[in-house]
C-alpha cells in the first residue's frame, strides 16, 4: 500500500515586539532552514525541530512560538550561539504528512524570516528505520545504530553472514540482480541475517538507478523494470533484516540525471516510507548536492590507494558532512581491494585503519567496505580484514558517543598530521585521534576545560596522565587512539554485593573490545550465535552482554570465571536481564516466549521467562554435602530461545552471609 497522507499546515507563530509588528516588514525565506530531527516520527510523543541558523545570526536573540491550526504546542526564546538550534515540540498528531511552516523573528531587525519543510508521522512498525538528522545516525529497533559492514557478491555464500557477524559487523550489502528466479536465494540470506541480528543494505540497482557491479539485466524494458522494483519492495519492506534501500551507484559516472533518480526515489518512498534510501557517489563527491531530493543517505567511495594520499578519504567525509549537516547522514565506502583494474595494490591494514577513523572523525556515521568475498579473495590479506573486524568492535563500543546529542567539550591537537574529535556521553568524554602520516607521531592534546587525572586508553588496557587539560601520547604510523575521561563521579544504579564471587560482574572490562573478559564461551550448535558487550543497553555501569540466539536451542553458553564452592553450601545467584521480542526472524509470532537458563556448574539450573523491561532474576542452588566434584565451580548462562536479550550485573554469594552480602551498609 502506498502512502496516503492528508497535507495539513504546521505553523511556527512568532511573537514580535510591538514596535516591529508593521505592515512594511520584509520577508526573507532563504536565510533559515528547518528540518525535523528524525526523518519521521511514529511512537514518540515528543520531537525536535532543527533550526539551521545563518552565521551572521548565531548570537542574535530569537523568539519563537509553535502551533498547529492556532493551537500552541511549544515555545522557545534564546540565542542559538551556533549553526543549529534544537527546539522541542509536542507530537499529538495522527499519521500523516504535514507541511511545516516557520516564521523567525530576530530581535532588533524589522525583517520576518520564513522557512518550510515536511513533518512525517507514520504508524509504528517494528522493523522501521529512522535517520537522525542531528547525529547522522540511525534509529533501529528503537536504539541507536551505527552501520558498519561491507559489500559482497552474489550468490551470497551461506556461511558468510555468520563468519562476519561474530567479528562485529552488523550490516551487509550484496550486489545482485533482481531476477524472479533468484528470489529464493535473496530470501535465504535475508532470513539468515535476521536470525543473526545483522541488517541488510538492500541493493535495488538492477531495477532502479543502475550502476554497480553486475547489475545490468539485458533486455529488460522500463515497464518490466518498474514492476520488478515494486514487487521487490513489497516482498521485503516488512522483513526484520531490512536496513535501507540502495537505489543508485555513482549516478554521475553512469549519466543518471537527478530528475530520473528523484522519480525512482519517490516511488520507493511511496511504497515504503519506513526505510531510508541511499545513493553512492564517485569523485567529485560534491556532485551529490544535485541529487539531494533523491536520497536520505549520502555515500561516497574514495579509493586512493596506492596513487593518492589516504587523507582523501577523510577530506571527502568532512566535505559531505559539512554540506549535509542537519539534513542527511553520510556514509563512507573505504577501499578494501586492489591489485587489478586501476589499483595496483590493496590497502595495508594500517591504511585501512587510518581511512576508516579519518572518515568517522570527519563526520561519517556509516562504514561499508568495498568489498568482501571470503575467506581470502577480497581483500586478499586476512590480516587486513581482521583489522576491519577489530574496528567494527571498536566502533560498536563507541556508538553512544558517536551518536550522542550532548554538547561536547572541544579538544585540540598540536600536530597537523593528527586529526581529532571529541564526544560527551553521560559524563564521560571520549577523544578520538588518528594519524594521517605514514610515520609515528607525538600527539599533544589540549582539552577546553581544566582537568587533572587519568585518561583511559581504550582498547589498549592502559592510561595516560592529564594535567590541567593537557596530555601527550604516541600514535603509530596511520594509527588511531581513543581516550576516555570521566568528567563527573559515577552515580551507580546498583551497588554490588560485598561478598560477590563473580569477577567483572557488570561486564565493564573492555581490554578486548566487544567481548566479556571473565568467561569462556561454548557453542550450542550455531556458529553465528553471539555474545557481544553492548554499551547502548545496560542496567548499571556502561555495558551489558547482548546474547543473540539464531535458532531455538542453539544458544552460546557462557561459563563465567570459577570460584571455590563448599560442599553443603547454598548459593544465591542474581542477574538482571531484558529481551526485545520485536527483533529476530520470528519477531512476528504472537505470544512467543523468550527465556534463559542460569546454572551453578552441573548441580542445578533454573529457567526464567524474559520480559521487555529490566528485571532482576534470583535463584538458589545447594551443592550436595557428599560431592566428589572439584571445589571450583562456575555460573553458566545461556538463552535457548531464539532472539536477543541483554544481561547485566551477575552476582553469586553463599547464603550463610547473604544479609551482609546484599547490603553494602552492613559491616563485618
What is the predicted function of each stretch?
Residues 109-165, 278:
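N-terminal carbohydrate-binding accessory modules
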Residues 158-225, 231-232, 257-276:
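Aromatic-lined substrate-binding rim segments of carbohydrate-active enzymes
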Residues 203-205, 264-287, 325-339:
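Aromatic-lined carbohydrate-recognition surfaces of secreted/lumenal glycan-active proteins
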Residues 208-213, 320-350:
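Active-site clefts of carbohydrate-active enzymes
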Residues 228-258, 282-288, 293-304:
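Active-site groove signature of glycoside hydrolases
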Residues 414-450, 478:
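Carbohydrate-binding surface patches
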Residues 467-496:
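C-terminal beta-strand-rich structural cap/linker in extracellular carbohydrate-active enzymes
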Residues 490-668:
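Extracellular and organelle-lumenal recognition/adhesion modules and their flexible linkers in secreted
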